Amino acid sequence: MPTINQLVRHGRKVIKEKSKSPALQGHPQKRGVCVRVSTMTPKKPNSALRKIARVRLSNGIEVTAYIPGIGHNLQEHSVVLVRGGRVKDLPGIRYKIIRGALDTDGVENRKQSRSKYGTKRPKK
């Protein structure tokens, strides 16, 4: 516990908040190029093959990003848009690829939550 005099001389130290998506460098999204597209198994109680991509961002940083939704058209050299947001059951994955932007297609036959998966409105 500092004295009043010590506080007058030095003041309080401001605790800086650590970014949860440092590779984006404060930007909401970043463009990148897929280096590798593969699958990964989730943490303990879950079982699946989650689709992931290794992406080299436009600032030169390489990150691993999750590909949401059922099915995708990504391959090496695809240009993608990456946003922040972790996947709870995949350790080390702190970014997601935005569906329906740049080279990424939207999810086929999606009826609900379409805006999150880049799907156009279905014809009646």
UniProtKB/Swiss-Prot annotation:
It comes from the Bacteria. The keyword Ribonucleoprotein applies. The modification 3-methylthioaspartic acid is found at residue 89. GO terms for biological process: translation. Residues 104-124 are annotated as: Disordered. InterPro entries: NA-bd_OB-fold (IPR012340), Ribosomal_uS12 (IPR006032), Ribosomal_uS12_bac (IPR005679). Disulfide bonds: none annotated. GO terms for cellular component: small ribosomal subunit. Gene3D superfamilies: Nucleic acid-binding proteins. It holds the Pfam family Ribosom_S12_S23. Keywords: Methylation, Ribonucleoprotein, Ribosomal protein, RNA-binding, rRNA-binding, tRNA-binding. Belongs to the universal ribosomal protein uS12 family. Part of the 30S ribosomal subunit. Contacts proteins S8 and S17. May interact with IF1 in the 30S initiation complex. With S4 and S5 plays an important role in translational accuracy. Interacts with and stabilizes bases of the 16S rRNA that are involved in tRNA selection in the A site and with the mRNA backbone. Located at the interface of the 30S and 50S subunits, it traverses the body of the 30S subunit contacting proteins on the other side and probably holding the rRNA structure together. The combined cluster of proteins S8, S12 and S17 appears to hold together the shoulder and platform of the 30S subunit. This is Small ribosomal subunit protein uS12. It comes from Thermosipho melanesiensis (strain DSM 12029 / CIP 104789 / BI429).
